Amino acid sequence: MLKLIIPTIMLLPLTWLSKTHMIWINTTTHSLIISSIPLLFLNQTNSNLYSYSLLFSSDPLSTPLLMLTTWLLPLMIMASQHHLSNEPPSRKKLYLTMLISLQISLIMTFTATELIMFYILFETTLIPTLVIITRWGNQPERLNAGTYFLFYTLVGSLPLLIALIHTYNTLGSLNIVLLTLTARELTDSWSNSLMWLAYTMAFMVKMPLYGLHLWLPKAHVEAPIAGSMVLAAVLLKLGGYGMMRLIPILNPLTKHMAYPFIMLSLWGMIMTSSICLRQTDLKSLIAYSSVSHMALVVAAILIQTPWSFTGATTLMIAHGLTSSLLFCLANSNYERTHSRIMILSQGLQTLLPLMALWWLLASLTNLALPPTINLLGELSVLMAMFSWSNITILLTGLNMLITTLYSLYMFTTTQRGTPTHHTNNMKPSFTRENTLMLMHLSPILLLSLNPSIIAGFAY
């Protein structure tokens, strides 16, 4: 794993030692090269799962998430260039340092084998994200958003720390492999139920589960572009990853405890999709759509069948790329119109025809059109839910319908209609932006040719 961690750490001196006009080129090139390293981890067979080291190892669940994390850093750097064009060089370097340190802690979180180390790194990701949101956001409300983000996550995570210490006292080890192999059966007593809640609550806040999701729209709306991208694409997946790691340790109690949470996520999925239909703020709409997509993942993980785990992993990767792409598109609109209100940016199709193509493709991937991996993930989860209970098909089917509606609503309000007066002197789309959109879309479409590499343990 060091062959991935050390080059990423070396991005820090590269950033600070580069000349001012070379910062973007150097960091983008270096981070693109780093993003090819996780591809080496793909050819592991299931037999030598933990073959790396005692501290860091990768397996079929963490490798796709590592690929997503490393692929996202060059894209974030490319997306931030216009946003930081008026900042002094030291401020640009500090911003990049925050992104890189976030990347390092994410890589180490996805590969940690000790649960306490996983917990510490899980919390470490808060600090750079908080700095990015509260320092580089656009509106004064960003401080409020930062407080929400910090307190929701910390209050959710404290019970997890206590539960981990309790487990360590009783079992003497917190190695994930050992715990999975030697886990005691948890009976459904009050104390065990509370421990189950303590274990899962941190991840449910992070996912976020409906009801614990209020920090997400605030944080997304106020964050700068790179903050929104990494928050939607990778930080939400930390919750799913943690749940998939820890749920097998908590059996058979999960079978009893999962019902209210599955119901809540199915209900929340429809509620947040419906909320999307009456949003006027573009970034807020994309944030709520993230909540509804991740609700499916929560339900899938709690069912605990191989198919639902496959669907959850695929859906996490697909959603990471799609929502990041949507935030990039929203940001390109924001940089031109200086407003997030959708109606004010209507009729952009006539002014930026190529951007309209990216908008169309992004909307279609968001509503899970074949042959994208979004469809594969949703179908796997749908079938797993259906075999768990037939009635769920009504809720998931309704959710698919509403998702289609709000995706097309988002597309038509921003692209169709008559252009408003303040969009007359608009800049054309830059090559950098088109490349950025293409680099988001190409993995979504290409992975549909060989989806087994992001399907997790089932393959």
Swiss-Prot record:
One of its GO terms (biological process) is mitochondrial respiratory chain complex I assembly. GO terms for cellular component: mitochondrial inner membrane; respiratory chain complex I. The keyword Glycoprotein does not apply. The gene is MT-ND4. GO terms for molecular function: NADH dehydrogenase (ubiquinone) activity; ubiquinone binding. Keywords: Electron transport, Membrane, Mitochondrion, Mitochondrion inner membrane, NAD, Respiratory chain, Translocase, Transmembrane, Transmembrane helix, Transport, Ubiquinone. It is an enzyme of class 7 (translocase). Core subunit of the mitochondrial membrane respiratory chain NADH dehydrogenase (Complex I) which catalyzes electron transfer from NADH through the respiratory chain, using ubiquinone as an electron acceptor. Essential for the catalytic activity and assembly of complex I. It is found in: Mitochondrion inner membrane. The chain crosses the membrane at residues 20-42, 60-80, 94-110, 113-133, 145-165, 196-216, 224-244, 257-277, 284-303, 308-330, 341-361, 391-411, 437-457. This is NADH-ubiquinone oxidoreductase chain 4. Its EC number is 7.1.1.2. The keyword Lipid biosynthesis does not apply. Its main location: mitochondrion. It is a multi-pass membrane protein. It comes from the Eukaryota. It catalyses: a ubiquinone + NADH + 5 H(+)(in) = a ubiquinol + NAD(+) + 4 H(+)(out). NCBIfam families: NDH_I_M (TIGR01972). Core subunit of respiratory chain NADH dehydrogenase (Complex I) which is composed of 45 different subunits. It comes from Pongo abelii (Sumatran orangutan). Belongs to the complex I subunit 4 family.
